[in-house]
Amino acid sequence: MAICLSDTCFGHTLLFIGKTKLLLLMAATLILQHSTTAADGAAGAGNSSLAKPGCRDKCGNVSIPYPFGIGKDCFREGFEVYCSTPDKVPILNTSGTPLLEINLNFGEARIQNNISQACNITKFNMVLGASIPVQRFFMVSRTRNIFTAIGCSTIALIAGEIQTPIEEDGGFIFDGISACGSFYTEDIIDNTTKDCSGRGCCQTAIPRNLKSFIPFFLNNSLLGAQIFSPCSYAFIAETGWFAFHPSYVTSQNLQNQFGFGPPLVLDWVAGNGSCEASRKMGSSYPCIDANSECVDVPNGPGFRCNCSTGYEGNPYLAGGCRGQSACTHLRN
């Protein structure tokens, strides 16, 4: 039984404990704290236990828990991570972008996106920006990201996967499209505004089930906007990351102003079917720990694995879910 010598565990009852019993209790607590510290140290070193045994658990400062992994036989199919040298930057194989963080509990991965731009569009035209493919077990999180466009006389669109080519006119049908418009004239620029509501900057929700995306720009040079705002920008980023400033509408290289690209949150699943169907996968069933459970994800087809109530760790590894101590429950 764990003993916690704190108000959290005992309240003011310590005032009524005899001196001898109190000293014994304090001694027992010190011994327990020593053993707990040692255990915590082992668990800290064993954050490597979140990786597959014998495999690297980090690339730079980013922890790489299984089913992700670095090197042969260290990852589940579709979750390979490259660790670039000498910078030690983890690269997610499915998108080819830097990996910032992996969250096992929520089934999320933060990657570094880029900012698409189109400059000096002198007539009504559509320009394609840079695209990022997000494949197989990954999807752009609709609840954790937002689509942003910056510029004057700009309409930006974000399109999902190309589903069907249209033979008659050479066009395509996309899985989903979101758009927002940004209009600003030089004489009404307010250098104090930080609002992203359509004057120089606009934001909108992204389409559902977005696995790959391509930014488009429509610019019709309204009121000679090209003279003072030559470029239009668009990007998907983690909600709350971006703060608009009016100077961005006149920038000719917004990416350089931020140094690195915006963070983008991906949802990932262990499989694309349902929990019921996944249990027929046999040896390839990913929730292999005895104290794990399968959970159908709410935001699209697929499932992921969680440790059962009272356990924590990595449900994708045998023995990966460990029992939580009584003190851990009290702290939570």
Q: Where are the model-predicted features located?
A:
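Typically disulfide-stabilized, N-glycosylated extracellular/lumenal ectodomains of secreted
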Residues: 2-332
